[in-house]
Amino acid sequence: MRKVKLAALQFSCTQEAKENIAKADQMAREAAAQGAQVILLPELFERPYFCQERKYGYYHYAKPVMENEAVLHFRELAKELQLVIPVSFYEREGILLFNSVAMIDAGEVLGVYRKTHIPDDHYYQEKFYFTPGNTGFKVWDTRYGKIGVGICWDQWFPETARCMALMGAELLLYPTAIGSEPILDCDSMPHWRRTMQGHAAANIVPVAAANRIGLEEVFPDEENGGQRSSLLFYGSSFITDE
């Protein structure tokens, strides 16, 4: 049986992309020093979760995969330390915008997965920013095994995990940005974990999720229609095999 060491990182995200990339770099190096070979980062970790509000100005965050700062940075880190790192980023492909992950294997970008399931409610307004993915589910044959990656809301749908398992995935990873549910007034964390434990048990494959942490607030202005809101991202990143 193949033995692989996996690290799931969680941290709060500031307004400065360079700060968030540097923080993720430091944590990834610390994990690698402890033997981690696969590093999982949270969803859209370059910035605060901008999908909490609607602003056209945020569209400029989207870049082609080989122009994204985080992808380029972690491509070099993965090459230096011989790591596998799926990097979540806001992707521009022509006139289309996607919530994507670039799978990096020791410096090589093996390909991109684009988020299939796009949430849309009062505080997770992703359909304003992202087109549903057109890649289909993907599994990559990396130096540390066959790895499939879903993105956040993908994890709620059993088809995501099952499709990747049927494609031969030995490990399923979910970069995530999930927190409080002000409209429902409930704690979704236990349900979130149990759902993915079910995916692991049903497909007989380890599953990991990396989530951000911290309170992120939106303040009213003309462009967001006077919205005032906040989300408390609860972290609770985990690795499970059942």
Describe every region a protein language model picked out.
Residues 115-129:
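A short, polar/charged loop-to-alpha-helix boundary motif
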Residues 66-84, 152-242:
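CN hydrolase (nitrilase-like) catalytic-core segments centered on the catalytic cysteine
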Residues 87-89, 100-103, 138, 237-239:
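Short beta-strand scaffold segments in enzyme catalytic cores
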Residues 1-6, 139-148, 171:
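Beta-strand-turn-beta hairpins that frame and shape the catalytic cleft
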Residues 112-114, 174:
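Residue-level detector of high-confidence beta-strand sites
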Residues 54-67:
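A charged helix-plus-loop insertion that forms the helical arch/lid used to bind
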